[in-house]
Each structure stands twice: as C-alpha cells, then as structure tokens.
Amino acid sequence: MIFYFSGVGNSKWVAHKLADALHDKVLPIAEEIRKEAVYTPMKGERVGFVFPVYGWEPPKIVLDFIRKMQMQASDYLYFVCTCGDDTGKTNRIFTQAIEKKGVFNTHPL
C-alpha cells in the first residue's frame, strides 16, 4: 500500500508510477485522514509514503496522518519525497514520527 499526499500533482504522479511498477494500491492521505481505518499489511507487504517536501520537512497533513493512523506492523516501510533541491530535515522528522508509532523498524540509509 502506498499512502500519498500531493499539493500540485507531482507526488501523486510518483505514487501512481510506483504503484504500477510494484503492483500496489494507492491511498490518498487527504481522504484517508478522515477515516477511522485500521491498516493491516499482509506478510511481506511494503508500506510506502510519497509526499512533497515543504520547508525542509514533511507536510503537516502527512505527520498528522501518521500520528492518527492505526496500523499493524509491517516488515518494510519506505518513503519517497519530491522536492526542488534539498530535503532538509525530512528524513529525520519522518523517521521520528514513524518510530513513535512503534510498529515499524527503521533502518537509516
């Protein structure tokens, strides 16, 4: 499953290209954040996040969604961010938000 947020469409395009290549489903964060869903990845299923970098960090809606979401553990989590030239503190901020959920093991690159 690939969760995405897109402001002008770039991240949406990336999410759909990834989903096509990985035979995965795409879930828009702007819609999913309104739901009270529990996400249960199947064994070995990847969980991805795609979003733009806003001010050298993930957009507020992405961090709010991570805090709100209920998810069972996943073996593999990744994120892809779109940006002009610099991701700033995005990796650190996103990783900290995910680690607080306690359901993902993060491995820095």
Where is each model-derived feature located?
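FMN-binding flavodoxin-like domain, especially the glycine-rich phosphate-binding loop
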Residues: 2, 7-109
